[in-house]
């Protein structure tokens, strides 16, 4: 058999081959995959042929944990793996995102910054996030009320989404509640690239009796909107330790609702002022 005959036979066989799937079939398969962020995807049952599917459905509706995702041999199902990767990406994104300056201005907040200059430095040098920049110190001394009963501070922390998502349901009711309780409220402001301990310098600088820091939590897998409140009585840079802080964590729509957290923080501030204590020294 000569070379031309071989090439002709190969060409004929290739032309007779059928594609594995037509574009129509491929599109149909792709359209079957739900949006990974949708409620349908979150409540998806991956267990094949379950005995009582209604029990699994109720379990999936009652928790955000990864239950009922099923297996394919020793491996996770494709959709379960894709959701895992999507949730992981979402958590990374909220750490790296910046709170827009336009959003801060819209809320009418004064903005200051820690000694951190950018997000990369914030993640690699947490010590700098615990201190105010020189410009921030000057700004707070000239534009903020001194010696308040309660100073409310908002900071991005490790979750931008936690601040932008929960702010409207948390901060206005909190300020209103503190005012109705008869407390003198300091000027609320936003600290970019802040860490928890920065509230000690703020309290010492403004001579606040109670400092309430609302800061974005390190995100969990797929949960990027969780906020924490760290409240402390008469903090100082040198003497305040972590045991002096009272923490209310997991503030978001799927945890402690923001509006409910506002009421809890108001009661907490009242107790701190009455007992002149916070953290482990505060009686429940």
From Swiss-Prot:
Swiss-Prot/TrEMBL GO biological process terms: amino acid metabolic process; ethanolamine catabolic process
Record pathway: Amine and polyamine degradation; ethanolamine degradation
Record-listed adenosylcob(III)alamin binding positions: 196, 217, 247
This protein's name: Ethanolamine ammonia-lyase small subunit
Family: Belongs to the EutC family.
UniProt-listed InterPro entries: EutC, EutC_C
Top-level taxon: Bacteria
């Amino acid at each position: 058999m000569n070379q031309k005959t071989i090439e002709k036979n190969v060409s004929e066989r290739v032309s007779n081959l059928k594609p594995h799937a037509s574009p129509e079939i491929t599109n149909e398969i792709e359209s079957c995959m739900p949006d990974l962020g949708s409620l349908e995807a979150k409540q998806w049952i991956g267990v094949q042929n379950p005995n009582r599917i209604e029990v699994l459905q109720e379990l999936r509706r009652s928790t955000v944990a990864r239950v009922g995702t099923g297996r394919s041999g020793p491996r996770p199902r494709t959709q379960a793996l894709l959701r895992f990767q999507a949730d992981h990406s979402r958590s990374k994104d909220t750490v790296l995102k910046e709170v827009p300056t336009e959003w801060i201005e819209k809320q009418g907040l004064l903005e200051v910054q820690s000694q951190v200059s950018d997000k990369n430095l914030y993640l690699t040098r947490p010590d700098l996030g615990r201190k105010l920049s020189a410009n921030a110190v000057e700004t707070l001394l000239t534009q903020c009320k001194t010696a308040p009963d309660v100073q409310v501070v908002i900071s991005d922390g490790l979750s931008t989404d936690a601040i932008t998502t929960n702010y409207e349901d948390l901060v206005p009711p909190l300020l209103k509640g503190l005012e109705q309780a008869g407390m003198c409220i300091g000027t609320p402001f936003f600290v970019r690239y802040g860490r928890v301990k920065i509230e000690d310098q703020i309290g010492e600088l403004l001579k606040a009796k109670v400092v309430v820091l609302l800061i974005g939590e390190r995100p969990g897998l797929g949960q990027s909107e969780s906020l924490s409140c760290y409240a402390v009585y008469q903090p100082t840079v040198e003497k305040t330790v972590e045991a002096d802080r009272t923490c209310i964590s997991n503030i978001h729509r799927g945890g402690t609702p923001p509006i409910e957290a506002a009421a809890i923080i108001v009661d907490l501030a009242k107790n701190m002022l009455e007992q002149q204590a916070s953290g482990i020294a505060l009686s429940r």
